[in-house]
Curated annotation (Swiss-Prot):
This is Argininosuccinate lyase. GO terms for biological process: arginine biosynthetic process via ornithine; L-arginine biosynthetic process. It is found in: Cytoplasm. Keywords: Amino-acid biosynthesis, Arginine biosynthesis, Cytoplasm, Lyase. The lineage of its organism: Archaea, Thermoproteota, Thermoprotei, Sulfolobales, Sulfolobaceae. Gene3D superfamilies: Fumarase/aspartase (C-terminal domain) (1.10.40.30), Fumarase/aspartase (Central domain) (1.20.200.10), Fumarase/aspartase (N-terminal domain) (1.10.275.10). It is an enzyme of class 4 (lyase). The keyword Cell membrane does not apply. One of its GO terms (cellular component) is cytosol. NCBIfam families: argH. It comes from Sulfurisphaera tokodaii (strain DSM 16993 / JCM 10545 / NBRC 100140 / 7) (Sulfolobus tokodaii).
Amino acid sequence: MVLYRRWGTEKDFVSTYTSSIDSDKEIVEEVKVVMKAHVIELYLSGYITKDTAKRILLAINSFHELKEGYEDIHEALEDHIIKTVGEEGGWVGFGRSRNDHVATALRLKMRKYLIEILYDIISLRKTLIEKSKTSTEILFPTYTHFQPAQPSTLAHYFLYIEDELDTIWNYIYSSLLLVNRSPLGSGAIVGTNVKLDRKREAELLGFDDIIYNTISATSSRLDLINAVSNLSLLMLFFSRIAEDLILLSSMFINIVKLPDSHVSTSSLMPQKRNAVTLEILRSKAGECFGDLSSLFNIYKGLPSGYNLDLQEMNKHYWDCVKIVNSSIEVINSILEGIEVLNFQLDDKTTATDVAEDLAITGIPYRKAYMEVANKIRAGTFISEISPKTSIYKKAVIGSPNPELINEEIKIKENRIAEEESKLKKYEEKIIGKMNELKVIEDDLIL
């Protein structure tokens, strides 16, 4: 079904090739909500009657199935409205372009996903805090250059993960704030002669503000790319953790045991415990980076203003988002069930402690360092400092000393609570604004 005017004729294969129907299935509800806001704004601005607004809103509510044969969701919805309401349904095209409409719907969908992901990261961080509380004295190795470094604890490792997640959480929250601005009312590129209140439309849709310049509003995808970029940073970090756990659970190192639900055996070798979930996560991180790369490559050569290339970016937003959603769940499950096996730390991992103790007695550190190093090379080094003693000797904030770790846990718990509260208040503000849209809609149709 071709609703909008075209030049010349169009072959079926061309319609199929340029159609965005498949990727538009992701934003059906958002497109409907944006259309409602537009119809309500036309009514509030005096361009359509209450009866026309009511009939159009009821038609929007009756649109459920996105059928093949249309160029996109916008064409399908408008055709449904006109067929349901009659000629009066054609008012939905007044003061509106698919360009500002889709840009708004994409932001609504990304906003929804980002809020979900932010809550999921909070949940994961809480898991790490609870695991840390019972792991302050469980010895755990550290590595630099993947060579044994110094003794640490499992709690120290868990809090390292939480620390990185805190940073990434704030990156993603900043993306949420950028995404939550409204393009609606910007028309195709230079606005419209129809006197619409863009700020009122933005309020009804729960946005914080409008994107002022109409060229930017209709054709920029930088805020969405920024969101995918920050989600990719989360996957980048998850991939490092996956690599840690794959190596540490291998029979060569054998320091951690992964939950049985996240390993698989071999069809031939019955002794195998393959870290299959983490291997898939590691590869899915690459898929997310591929989505980001695709966004860059599609976007980089476009002249300013809307181009249909932009619709080919949409599937990459949602692919990365869904990878992130499932990966958070996987990491959470693995970290909840991970076990540290009995293992022996090499005495030489406390060599730094020995050198520092010598320096504390008044020997210049480099001289103390060389004294210890020479004994190690000569094979005569014996440390009287146990790994457990080593961790208790650590004197700086952020180190694995259990006493300092417990203080860090309290600080992190407070920070998580503050960030969760901030997110909840922000979400409630959005919901409160959108409730006004629902109130007006109900007043019109009931």
